[in-house]
Structure formats: C-alpha cells, structure tokens
Amino acid sequence: MIWHVQNENFILDSTRILMKAFHLLLFHGSFIFPECILIFGLILLLMIDSTSDQKDRPWFYFISSTSLVMSITALLFRWKEEPIISFSGNFQTNNFNEIFQFLILLCSTLCIPLSVEYIECTEMAITEFLLFVLTATLGGMFLCGANDLITIFVAPECFSLCSYLLSGYTKRDVRSNEATTKYLLMGGASSSILVHGFSWLYGSSGGEIELQEIVNGLINTQMYNSPGISIALISTTVGIGFKLSPAPFHQWTPDVYEGSPTPVVAFLSVTSKVAASASATRIFDIPFYFSSNEWHLLLEILAILSMILGNLIAITQTSMKRMLAYSSIGQIGYVIIGIIVGDSNDGYASMITYMLFYISMNLGTFARIVSFGLRTGTDNIRDYAGLYTKDPFLALSSALCLLSLGGLPPLAGFFGKLYLFWCGWQAGLYFLVSIGLLTSVVSIYYYLKIIKLLMTGRNQEITPHVRNYRRSPLRSNNSIEWSMTVCVIASTIPGISMNPILAIAQDTLF
C-alpha cells in the first residue's frame, strides 16, 4: 500500500515538472530556440543509441552536425532583433550574447569532423563523446546569455563537468587520468571561490541576483565602495581566471592539453575561452561598474603575466600540445586587452574579431596535430622535421595557421592583432600594448622554428616517423582535411577583407 502511494506521488510530481517545463518552453521557447535545437539533437542521439542494436556511426555525426548547423541558422535569422530578457530575468538575448553563441557553435561544428578519424582509430565510444560535446556547447551558450548569478554559476558548471569527462575519455591512458584529476580538483576549487564572490555581491546588493538589479541594489545600500565588493571582485576574478587560464591561473592548462585526447583539447582550447570571455565582459562591466579602476588593474596584471610567461615558456617546449597550451596563455593576454578597453573604443569589437580569427588559427593547427599523430603516434616537435616531403598539403596548411597565430601580414592574425592593439593604444594602454607587441615578436620565433622543421629537406634531419609516414586509407580522412581547409581559408582570406567582419563585430555592442 505504501509503495503504491509513493509511486502515485512520484508520477504526480513528474507530471507537474513536465507540465512546468512544457509551459516554460511554450512561452519562452522562442527566446532560446537555438538551444532547444541542441536539446532536441541530444534527445535524438540518446533515443537512437538506446534503440539501435547496430550502431551506424555516420548517423551520429550527421545528427550532431545538423543540430549545430540548424542552431547557427536560427541565430542568424534572429540577428538584429531587439534585446529581450526572458525566464523572469534569468536569460538575456541580444546581439552581443548571440555573437559569442555563434562562435561557440562554430567551434563545435568544426571540432566534430576533426574528431571522426581519431574516434575510429582509437575505438572511443562515439555516442558519449558527441553527447558531452553538445552538452558542453549548450552550457556555453546558456552562459553567454546568462543574466543572473545563479545561471552564471550553473551554466559553466554544465560546461565544466562535460570538459572533465571529455579530458578523461581515454581511461586507459595514465596521462589522461592525471590531467582529469588536476582539472577536476582545480576546477572545483575555482568554482567554490567564484560562488564565494557571488555571495558577497548578493549580500551587498540587498539580496539581488540579476546583474542590473545588483547595481541598483548597491546604490540603494550604499555598499558599492565597501570592502565586501573588493572581496567579491578578487574572488570573481580568480574564478573566471581559471576558465580563461591566464597566468597565474594557468597551472592546469599544459597538463590537460598534453594528457587529453587531441580533439578534446581542440574543443576546449577555444570554446572555454569564448564562453568565459562573454561572461567576464558582462560581470565586470555591470555588477562591478563602480570598481572599474580596480578590475582594470587586476586584468592588466593578468594580461602582462600571460603575454610574458606564456610566450617565453612556449619557446622551451618539446611537445606540440604543450607548446600550444602556453601559446594559448599568451593569446588570452591579448584578448584581455579588449576586455579592459570595453565598448568605449571598440574594445569588445576588436576582441570578438580576434577571437574569430583565433578559432580558425588554433583549430587548423590542432587538425594538423590530430592528422600527424594518428599516422605517426608522436607529438614531439622534432618529429615533424621534413613533413613537407611526405605531405605538402598538411605542412603548408600548418605553416599558414602558425604564421597567422604569430601575426605575420597579410594573414588574418596580423589584422586581428593590429585592430586589438590599435584599440588598446587609443584607450591609453600604452604599456600593455607595448608588451603585446614585444611578446608577439617572441611568439613568431617559436612558430617559425616549427615551420623550418616542417619544410626541411635534409635527409639527416628527417626523423623515422616522417620517413615511415603514410596517408590514412580511412574514408573519414576527408573530414579532417575539410576542417583544416576551412580553418586555413579563415586564417588567410579575412585579413584581406576586414571591413565586413569589423562592421558585424561593432554591431554586437550592448
């Protein structure tokens, strides 16, 4: 009898939850339509995986890629609409948020074909991999549109949990387990510090959680210059710093990059930074509006440390993935310049433009690492010597992406950095821009060192890995080349025609 009563209560509670979810989607679903497409894709993947005895892998890739492309299409159709706040103030839709959501979707769309051959060669479980990628993408999209402290905390945790699972996906690899453990422990600690900062904001504003209402609450309580806000600012900076991984919050980055599966590293290296940058701009610009001088100083210190340490330590690396890890630390220092400048001197527009180019440059480089690693089983920089003699397309595309990362003209990376540094100079950040220029020259050195190895034709320098190099006969080989081709084109051609990209980026300001 008791069991029947408990069962009936469970059914009633489940029905109420489903009805409430249906009510929310019915009245607010149009505001999160791109996210709903991804949710539908996730449900479809789960249904096919649970009902199909014989797994047809191409269908899983097709469903995942189609849902991402449809979500991008929905975002483009919604472009230029009036800003809307929905879900009782928890979520905001505007051009600024949507451009970051577009960047996250673009990263995921390029990462799936980049992963096909790797999954087939390593015999990884495909369904779980795609589910984690789509769920992480969903968490990043919700973070970009988050308008209150609870959503800003829950959304990145959704992204982070999937990131932990993805980084430890090759469970038999000791390095992968070590990377996951470090990532999980440091991620949990940073989340605790972040929520501690949010609690100070919540208390100081008189119990407000919406970003704009926090500002009004601080004015009403006269707490905007209190020590509590300083504690909140420091704690929030530390929490967001872990997601962005600038120095000195970069300790997890090299180990996670080296130990995780390469397609996972490619995905995390760009999506985490895009989502965290979107969140950082809103958190620093709105709740900490009265502490702008303080957070500008904190971010300037982080940017200087990141640009110097990231680029100097990258010179000494022998692993390609660890080199890109330290390179990404230096790159985030450049992005922070745009956050500091803000919307007064096109700082956000320059940051968005550079991040768009960084996605193509970084993913193009990782596509080459995936392709070379599957054929040779090595990640050592020295083992790339003479690759041009065996695979000219792979060597040339790698060289273009690396040159663009270094910021050499007339590639996209040069114009992205030029616009970013020009906006910083116009805003009076002379010292910061000077450091950026000097460290960019340093980065060109270690990128050119790799390109020299790729292009060498001396027999005595060509390693056994390249001598025994064979192109893969797998049909999925074209998927990596497709991703690489798209990234190479995006790393070169936009540098010639910058005006349309700048116009779109400038329209995103909120």
Swiss-Prot record:
Broadest EC class assigned to this enzyme: translocase
A Gene Ontology biological process term: photosynthesis, light reaction
Regions crossing the membrane: 24-44, 59-79, 99-119, 124-144, 149-169, 183-203, 295-315, 323-343, 347-367, 395-415, 418-438
Membrane-topology annotation of the record: Multi-pass membrane protein
Subcellular localization: Plastid, Chloroplast thylakoid membrane
GO cellular component: chloroplast thylakoid membrane
This enzyme's EC code(s): 7.1.1.-
InterPro entries: NADH-Q_OxRdtase_suN/2, ND/Mrp_TM, Ndh2_N
MF (Gene Ontology): NADH dehydrogenase (ubiquinone) activity; quinone binding
Entry keyword Thylakoid: yes
Catalytic activity field: a plastoquinone + NADH + (n+1) H(+)(in) = a plastoquinol + NAD(+) + n H(+)(out); a plastoquinone + NADPH + (n+1) H(+)(in) = a plastoquinol + NADP(+) + n H(+)(out)
Keywords, ordered alphabetically: Chloroplast, Membrane, NAD, NADP, Plastid, Plastoquinone, Quinone, Thylakoid, Translocase, Transmembrane, Transmembrane helix, Transport
Cleavable signal peptide: none
Lineage top rank: taxon: Eukaryota
Database matches in Pfam families: Ndh2_N, Proton_antipo_M
Protein role: NDH shuttles electrons from NAD(P)H:plastoquinone, via FMN and iron-sulfur (Fe-S) centers, to quinones in the photosynthetic chain and possibly in a chloroplast respiratory chain. The immediate electron acceptor for the enzyme in this species is believed to be plastoquinone. Couples the redox reaction to proton translocation, and thus conserves the redox energy in a proton gradient.
Homology family: Belongs to the complex I subunit 2 family.
Oligomer status and interactors: NDH is composed of at least 16 different subunits, 5 of which are encoded in the nucleus.
HAMAP family: NDH1_NuoN_1
Name of the protein this chain belongs to: NAD(P)H-quinone oxidoreductase subunit 2, chloroplastic
Organism encoding this protein: Asparagus officinalis (Garden asparagus)
Lineage of the species this protein comes from: Eukaryota, Viridiplantae, Streptophyta, Embryophyta, Tracheophyta
